[in-house]
């Protein structure tokens, strides 16, 4: 352990991503686990966070006191739920630390409140923290710009494990936003998320979404751009949840030296 290591807090420490984040922090140079947070009443309160994550004893007990942890930390890694993330955004702003947000399913109001917190915190938010997906977003934007809506239809297909609670996934929406930017349109006005019964012909220029859920799939995403007589498919497969955790830790380290503001993984990776 080095005194210059960035002190990080993991919220939602007992969840799948929380445990993965703890393990990745443990094995990554330049960072250390400062605190692990769970909800009040969680059976994991008081447990050693390292043992909980399968990384061995780390001397950090799981607690339900986020503000106390934040004020002594430098960053928080957050893959929780929208309501919790909004609360953590306010606390991170009070503590003026880095807030890395991988939470998906946020409403427009949630997004506005998270962005408001960025006046005092360094917020880095993305629907996906992996390098591969963010590169896929850049390629999707370029392809959507190059292939005109009059002859090319865009569909985004995603599949995740059966426990995922939001749809479309944050990554699918990230890709949809990239396609919309390429076309110079607003995604909210052009997305089609449900098809059932007699739908009629596909609206020209729309961006369709298809969602699959089942098994233990970590994440599969494809952007299909279909023309007359040919089709372009851009895709990404996640086979290990640690790619998101590694990206989140990299984002925290990047944000450490930045001014308060709202950033994305495109900023972190230099792809913007």
From Swiss-Prot:
For this chain's UniProt record, which GO biological process terms are given?
diaminopimelate biosynthetic process; lysine biosynthetic process via diaminopimelate
Localization annotation: Cytoplasm
Q: Which residues bind (S)-2,3,4,5-tetrahydrodipicolinate?
A: 161, 170-171
Listed A to Z, the keywords are: Amino-acid biosynthesis, Cytoplasm, Diaminopimelate biosynthesis, Lysine biosynthesis, NAD, NADP, Oxidoreductase
- Sequence positions that bind NADP(+): 39
Residues forming the catalytic site:
160, 164
Any GO MF annotation of the entry: oxidoreductase activity, acting on CH or CH2 groups, NAD or NADP as acceptor
Q: Does the keyword Transcription regulation apply?
A: no
Pathway, per UniProt? Amino-acid biosynthesis; L-lysine biosynthesis via DAP pathway; (S)-tetrahydrodipicolinate from L-aspartate: step 4/4
Residues the record lists as binding NAD(+): 12-17, 38, 102-104, 126-129
The Enzyme Commission number assigned here is 1.17.1.8
Catalytic activity line of the entry: (S)-2,3,4,5-tetrahydrodipicolinate + NAD(+) + H2O = (2S,4S)-4-hydroxy-2,3,4,5-tetrahydrodipicolinate + NADH + H(+); (S)-2,3,4,5-tetrahydrodipicolinate + NADP(+) + H2O = (2S,4S)-4-hydroxy-2,3,4,5-tetrahydrodipicolinate + NADPH + H(+)
Q: Which SUPFAM superfamilies match?
A: Glyceraldehyde-3-phosphate dehydrogenase-like, C-terminal domain, NAD(P)-binding Rossmann-fold domains
Function summary? Catalyzes the conversion of 4-hydroxy-tetrahydrodipicolinate (HTPA) to tetrahydrodipicolinate.
- According to UniProt, the name of this protein is 4-hydroxy-tetrahydrodipicolinate reductase
Which species is this record about?
A: Rhizobium meliloti (strain 1021)
Q: Which gene encodes it?
A: dapB
